[in-house]
Amino acid sequence: MAYDTTFMKLSLTERQALLDSGARLRVKAGGVIVRQGARLNGIYVVIEGEVRVEHGIHVVRQAVVNRGKGQGTIKEIPGRLSVEVRRLGRGAIFGEMSFVEDAPTSATVTAVGEVEVVFIDGGTVRAKLDGDPSFAARFYHSLAIVLSGRLREANKQARGIRPRGPMTPRPADPAQPADE
């Protein structure tokens, strides 16, 4: 079973019970499983296939229109830009941030090829968490490990991004007195 890293602090029996409590879904290539900003009450586990996690941002592009006879107008054109954050394969979970925070989803998740996922209802999970404090501790410890790993990965990716332009802070010159 490839779910060892997802719920690694749970026993095999507990992991299987979680998966068995969920609804299995098959999604065709290109199918959106979760849309950014949606309310989600549960967690998905990838059983087979691969999903793409994308974060969309609103952008405004400016264009000069109606040029002619020395006249032009600046028009703002709203749009959306999606950035692939990562891909997740067999055994990976998604929707966990929304579950933990009880907040809208932070990304769109799309099937790369045909995918099978299990959706574990949040009410089912919360009932188990409320009824078994030991399970709750192991469950949240497992989520913390997953989230920590993803944060480390994001930090590594961010190291390659360098700000440019006049707003880039410069290191302080030790020879110069500090402004007070």
Predicted regions and their residues:
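Cytosolic regulatory regions built on CNB/CRP/Popeye-like sensor folds
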Residues: 1-180
